[in-house]
A protein has these predicted regions:
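GHKL/Histidine-kinase-like ATPase module
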Residues: 6-145
């Protein structure tokens, strides 16, 4: 929760022991710090975490991502701070847009020849850590338990 809402401070205090224990969760960088945390046991391929945010039609979107030296993709989606399954629209849209952007860049800059096939999404997302956070009014979650 603290990663997903930059500036939010959550303080947990256990007063049961003689000496109370307190733990504070506060991440001013929000999802950028979340990506940094998830990549702590890997070596990033570039220093700066790619980050963008915007609001359109009362929908707020934040994306933070960074490639690392692992072979695994770790992309996580959230709607209103609730984790979402892998196949939801904002994750699929992010993956498709990322693949298209890489391929368009590669073609425009002659990194791929006209007769060569496009890069696959799996190749582009290898070693990728990404957080996609969407905030919307009146969300509808399939299978949501009340």
């Amino acid at each position: 929760m603290a990663f997903l809402t930059k500036g939010l401070k959550i303080v947990l205090r256990d007063e049961r022991p003689q000496e109370p224990i307190e733990k504070t969760f506060h991440y001013e960088g929000g999802i950028k710090e979340f990506v940094e945390y998830l990549n702590r046991s890997t070596t990033p391929l570039y220093e700066q975490i790619i980050y963008c945010e915007g609001i359109v039609n009362n929908v707020s979107v934040e994306v933070a991502m960074q490639h690392n030296d692992s072979y695994n993709e770790n992309s996580y989606g959230f709607v209103n701070n609730i984790t979402t399954p892998e196949g939801v629209t904002h994750i699929v849209g992010f993956r498709n847009a990322l693949t298209k952007t890489f391929n368009d860049y590669a073609r425009k800059n002659k990194l791929l020849k006209d007769n060569e096939p496009n890069l696959t999404g799996e190749d582009i997302r290898e070693g990728l850590t990404a957080i996609i956070s969407v905030k919307i009014e009146d969300p509808q979650f399939e299978g949501q338990t009340k």
